[in-house]
Amino acid sequence: MAVYCYALNSLVIMNSTNELKSGSPLPSGSETPQPSGRAALSPGSVFSPGRGASFLFPPAESLSLEEPGSAGGWRSGRRRLNSSSGSGGGSSSSNSSSSSGVGSPSWAGRLRGDAQQVVATRILSPPGPEEAQRKLRILQRELQNVQVNQKVGMFEAQIQAQTSAIQAPRSPRLGRARSPSPCPFRSSSQPPERVLAPCSPSEERRTKSWGEQCTETPDANSRRRSRLSTHPSKDKEGVAPLLGPASPTRLGTQSPSTSVRMERGSPASPRCGSPTPMEIDKRTAPSLEHFGTSLTLATKVAASAASAGPHPGHDSVLMEADCELGAMRPWEAHLERRGQFLGRETGSAPEPIRTHIREPPGRVERVHSVGGQGSWTPEVIKRPEEGTVDAQSSELSENPRWSRLPGDPGSVGPEKGGSRIPGIRGPQQTLDSMREGSSALGLLGGSQAAQPGSMDVETGISCGRMLEPLPPGEVTTNLKEPQCLPGDRMGMQPESSIVWPSAVEEAPLIWTCDTGIQLKGTWRSQDGDAHPSCQEKSPDQKDKACSPSNIPAIPAVIITDMGAQEDGGLEEIQGSPRGPLPLRKLSSSSASSTGFSSSYEDSEEDISSDPERTLDPNSAFLHTLDQQKPRVSKSWRKIKNMVQWSPFVMSFKKKYPWIQLAGHAGSFKAAANGRILKKHCESEQRCLDRLMADVLRPFVPAYHGDVVKDGERYNQMDDLLADFDSPCVMDCKMGIRTYLEEELTKARKKPSLRKDMYQKMVEVDPEAPTEEEKAQRAVTKPRYMQWRETISSTATLGFRIEGIKKEDGSVNRDFKKTKTREQVTEAFREFTKGNQNILIAYRDRLKAIRETLEVSPFFKCHEVIGSSLLFIHDKKEQAKVWMIDFGKTTPLPEGQTLQHDVPWQEGNREDGYLSGLNNLIDILTEMSQGSPLT
């Protein structure tokens, strides 16, 4: 931008020199060449037909005497175009310029534009009396016929057409936290020493028209014209004030039509970065009186008085002009722009006051106006991570609930007075900081009403210096409830102290150019991870402060390491002294409906790989679903496997006790959608495939094919416990033998002594082993298998009870010696608690199974060995029986069938399945005919 300013400066000087040599009757002063292709000016413009260069003049009411102390006053006999005041060189007696600095008319600075105007001034010899009189008449005629709003519109169009295609240079400096987003041009004439000022209340009023008048008091005008750049040599370098919202003055009158033309005619805002080092180093440090009201960090605040007209609004383009300010950080540049808005739109202050500066950048949200000029309304401070704000929050209409508090001397009109209502969100939202997702800046604007007395400044930042961020680790105060003190003084009451985690260099803000995109600010607090950002607010919520008390807590999900407990074998089921867990036990289908079914699919270990491990509720931990900082210490698969002690999901062992009862604890995994996975067995898969097409299908678990998981194949079938709540389960092994004839033949061919089987035999019956077996302290497998059938009811009744699990979780497998009919009846009575409805339901179900078996083609041509009947009922008196475990069920040779109810002899392959089923039906029928349960 500086190079561009130099080029324009050279062109203007050359053009003015040519006109001087040719004797052109133009006034000596600042001129801006009109580029070719520029739109023609309106008939009321100031360009006379004889002129070759364009020149605009400020309104007549803005012409006034300069302060006595200012250099180059209009009484010095020279004309000067004041680049930072409202005079603009419009006096009839001013003849020449007294400075060679580059500037722009003050009224041009109020134009909404995204570029800079460079106006060169030259020292020329005083013209003759006749020429001066002629120029005076021309000026008077032009000032009478030209409307200021037309000048503004056309002049803005020229500036935008001149600079719309120019890309600002990027600063090569490194190590600064800067904006990653494009932003409009900034004012390069602002010195780095200038104290930042808070934003004007009307900066964010987007819904009001520009057409409203804002006549300024003479005091305000004199303040804005009071200073010229005190460093002409630096002004010469092409550092011109920003045209647009950053200009310190504003036009006195402006029509709605002009505002519409200006808004529609403005091109897209060009991108810009930080200025070049040359431009940074050449900034000047004028006094704070340039801006009618500005915030003095260590001394005072020049508060605003009333303006004589309605408060002007802003369109959306005005909110775009946030950019880095030289060596400043983005938030500092942001504040400096707001200081310019404040100086432009507020009146003079009768008396300065002090304000509190307590928070680092991002800790305090910018205060908002509640409808009045020179009034501020504090809001409850947002946390740093609350940087994401819905774009809707920036498009607000005026709130009819605003009220004006008495005692505000700066209030003029019913809605223009300074009402200060803490905690009420006004019509203007934080457009630059909230809308682009950046955190709020570390300033609290104080009340701007005339108030005797002062507030203590708490940061000690001296006047004339930039507002530096607090160093890392410095204790700051989290302001919660701003209190409106008497006389509209704003005091902030600290609530708690926190440690600011890092310097501003490590946490740059995110800026955009009026895109409405929600971006998360990078300001983070170490103690605020659990609080979500206040992003979307309903219209009723927009006038409420966003405080942690209004933030709903995120429900925690209790998860536990499934891998550490899933294998905990169902040994806990068999006689564990622990009582039932205080958790609702659900089946996997119920669990799948809660969204945790995927955890079953990712089980890392088999459920019986370590049967000695127990379920320890103390190992449960609380895992919060943190959206701010996702945990990366554990893999997602591990997390899904840890759902164990959730109130929605019960233990896998509790849901599948029949797995342990049937002796297959190491073969199962849980699956989703009410299914379980059993280790693949070729013979069982073949049987299940055939059963799905057989009449027995209603009495067997539904088979859903085989799947590969963790490198292993599994048969996937229905979870039979899905429809039961706290079920009672019994496993009965059917048949008069539980081993295949092939197993017996193989064991005889290669007999091997098994000490483990001898130990089991001795535990059941110490007198069972023979003298030879006692001497060897070992038995063969065939011997053990045959002995095993004789000690239970298998050999006598055709079935035996493997185990019972009650609804309270207690497990009993001590049925090895349950041999007689009376013992079996007592076991069923204990299992059903004598409930006649359950006994009748079991009996009827067994009868239906028997009728189906008698006509089943599958049953006739298969030797069913090691299969079980699974009895399930619950407290709702639901009772079902299923046929399970077909791993040892083998097909017979072609044309051979079995009767299933004749005694077994080695070689006939009879299994005695129907014999055992008939005995079960008889026992249950006898029990169901007994006296009903009282």
UniProtKB/Swiss-Prot annotation:
Residues 20-46, 58-109, 161-282, 364-441, 522-549, 568-626 are annotated as: Disordered. The modification Phosphoserine is found at residues 42, 48, 70, 209, 274. One of its GO terms (biological process) is cellular response to calcium ion. Residues 92-106, 575-600 have a biased composition (Low complexity). The keyword Kinase applies. Its main location: cytoplasm. GO terms for cellular component: cytoplasm; cytoskeleton; cytosol; endoplasmic reticulum; membrane; nucleus. Pfam families: IPK. It catalyses: 1D-myo-inositol 1,4,5-trisphosphate + ATP = 1D-myo-inositol 1,3,4,5-tetrakisphosphate + ADP + H(+). Residues 20-35, 210-220, 250-260 have a biased composition (Polar residues). It is found in: Cytoplasm, Cytoskeleton; Cytoplasm; Endoplasmic reticulum. Substrate binds at residues 733, 754, 781-788, 888. GO terms for molecular function: ATP binding; calmodulin binding; inositol hexakisphosphate kinase activity; inositol-1,4,5-trisphosphate 3-kinase activity. Residues 756-764 are annotated as: Calmodulin-binding. IP3K is activated by calcium and calmodulin. Form B is much more sensitive to calcium/calmodulin than form A. ATP binds at residues 667, 678, 718-720, 731, 805, 885. Its EC number is 2.7.1.127. Keywords: ATP-binding, Calmodulin-binding, Cytoplasm, Cytoskeleton, Endoplasmic reticulum, Kinase, Nucleotide-binding, Phosphoprotein, Transferase. It is an enzyme of class 2 (transferase). Catalyzes the phosphorylation of 1D-myo-inositol 1,4,5-trisphosphate (InsP3) into 1D-myo-inositol 1,3,4,5-tetrakisphosphate and participates to the regulation of calcium homeostasis. Belongs to the inositol phosphokinase (IPK) family. Interacts with DMTN. This is Inositol-trisphosphate 3-kinase B.
